[in-house]
Amino acid sequence: MLSRRSFTTTLAAAAATSLVPRLLRAAGVTPARNVVLVHGLFADGSCWSDVIARLQPAGLNVTSVQNPLTTLDDAVAEAQRVLDRQDGPTVLAGHSFSGMIVTEAGVHPKVSTLVYVAARAPDAGEDYTALAKNYPTPPASAGIVFDGDEGRLTEAAFLRDFAGDVPEAKAKVLYAEQEPFHKALLTGKTMHAAWRSKLSFYAVSTEDRTINPDLERFMAKRMGATTIELKSSHVSLISHPQEIADLILQAAGQRR
């Protein structure tokens, strides 16, 4: 398995130039038959189910990572283990917090393209919390509660601020399935920024109450991502699974 420190400074230096996104776009998408999906906070791997159901008929080999939500190192290591098992070019997609994992683990040599779904996309070594403070605080933040070192979202905040455009009955099921996260997870910083060397795609949720939509737009623009905007809550992968599947198919070289 690749360690977080095993990548050369040559890659980092080459990726630092703002020309990289344009050069990657000119080179085109590398066809991929593998897709690895990573979930964020207040969820588990099943949150991708409706997207998976649209990717598999296209012949894609899809794996949804069960993110441990303990520390960033643990989460990245789990994603890397799944990436190690892929048999060729792979699209790595993440929702919400797992954009941190995509950004870090995305330097894995089997990853061909990156997809961010209303996701964090920090630069290498960047303090995401400090970056987010440049934008109004999203309402969901007030709904996080802790039992000791474990955090979760209250039901009211989940239904209103996380999954506001999902039918209430389904949103309540998703609320019951959310995986608690450990406080230590929030202290991690990415050491690499895969989007500086990999072709990237981004789905902005314009009605997001968990990550500020303008912050999403900033991160998408900074990485030079192919970007779509969806009139969606934070969980566009659930409320707009076809659009998210289409974006992943585009990243896999099966759509234009």
PLM segments and residue spans:
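Gly/Ala-rich beta-loop-alpha elbow adjacent to hydrolase catalytic centers
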Residues: 94, 98, 102
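Active-site loop/oxyanion-hole signature of alpha/beta-hydrolase fold enzymes
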Residues: 57, 61-91, 105-108, 128-133
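Post-His helix in hydrolase/transferase enzymes
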Residues: 238-250
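Conserved serine/cysteine hydrolase catalytic core
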Residues: 182-223, 229-232, 237
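N-terminal export signals
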Residues: 6-26
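C-terminal segment of N-terminal export signals and the immediately downstream linker at the start
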Residues: 1, 21-38
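Conserved HGGG/HGGXW glycine-rich cap/lid loop of the alpha/beta-hydrolase fold
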Residues: 33-72
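Flexible "cap/lid" loop of the alpha/beta hydrolase fold
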Residues: 111, 115-148
